[in-house]
């Protein structure tokens, strides 16, 4: 029984640390940078007032392995909860309303405690910024939440007199835009969901029937052949892909942009800095899926 409890505890701990996160990756830390960040966070976690004036508190620090240090920051975030309303929800209005509509959907604000984080990957010299519960963060709030986390950490550094390190600006993090096409083109792994553009219109596909990879499904292959016959190609602007790390362990990554941005004729390189990682059950899954994201970048 104690072994089972220990396994459950480990799974829960790993879920809180690594799973369902929106991440940004800064890949250019030096040994000096790492040393300075570690010393700065020692000051932050030694002073209970370090995050005063922000929405965050310094929650916990974990030396997960000799290669990874995880700094957690607690914040209470308001999200919208979707609910199908019942007769009891509608009260006296139920009979009239439900007589006109088969389903009534409502949204209400819910406060959720989140544990955002900054991770220092010592071995790979990376700084990883991550938002908790990535699946419930609305797309139009992602930039705002990452900016709030970055600014709050840097404000804590300044408050404590730390002058030699700062969390970088967003534009200094790795641009993941080219992973969109590469996740589709590279054979490794399985594509589980995709939104893509063709010469005629946009399509949104998910796994159905017994398909494990959209790209190998008959319904997708027919459309792909028709597009290629016209001289075009499948161009994804949102994509989810899973990779088998070990037998029956499939960490996943989702990344994408809004179609209007994808299709907009703008000069210069386009940018995408965030990826959503999920089905992460361990530290090894976490490092593995980040490596898969980075290896699928085309550096231009």
Outline where the language-model segments fall.
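Intrinsically disordered, low-complexity, charge-rich terminal extensions
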Residues: 1-300
């Amino acid at each position: 029984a104690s072994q089972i409890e220990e396994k459950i505890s480990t799974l829960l701990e790993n879920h809180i640390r690594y799973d369902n996160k929106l991440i940004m990756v800064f890949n250019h830390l030096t040994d000096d940078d790492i040393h300075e960040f570690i010393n700065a966070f020692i000051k932050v976690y030694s002073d209970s007032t370090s995050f005063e004036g922000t929405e965050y508190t310094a929650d916990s620090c974990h030396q997960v392995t000799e290669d990874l240090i995880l700094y957690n920051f607690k914040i209470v975030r308001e999200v919208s909860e979707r609910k199908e309303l019942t007769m009891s929800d509608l009260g006296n209005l139920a009979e009239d309303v439900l007589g006109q509509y088969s389903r009534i959907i409502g949204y209400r604000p819910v406060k959720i405690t989140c544990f955002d984080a900054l991770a220092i990957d010592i071995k790979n010299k990376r700084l990883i910024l991550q938002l908790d519960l990535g699946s419930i963060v609305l797309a139009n709030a992602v930039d705002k939440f990452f900016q709030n986390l970055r600014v709050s950490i840097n404000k804590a550094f300044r408050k404590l007199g730390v002058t030699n390190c700062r969390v970088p600006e967003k534009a200094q993090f790795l641009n993941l835009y080219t992973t969109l096409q590469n996740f589709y083109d590279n054979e490794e792994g399985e594509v589980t969901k995709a939104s893509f553009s063709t010469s005629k219109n946009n399509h949104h596909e998910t796994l159905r029937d017994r398909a494990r990879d959209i790209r190998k499904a008959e319904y997708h292959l027919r459309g792909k052949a028709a597009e290629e016959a016209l001289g075009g190609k499948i161009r994804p602007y949102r994509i989810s892909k899973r990779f088998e790390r070990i037998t029956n362990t499939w960490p996943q990554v989702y990344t994408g942009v809004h179609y209007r941005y994808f299709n907009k004729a703008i000069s210069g390189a386009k940018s995408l800095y965030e990826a959503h990682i999920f089905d992460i059950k361990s530290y090894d899954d976490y490092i593995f899926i980040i490596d898969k994201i980075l290896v699928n970048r085309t550096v231009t």
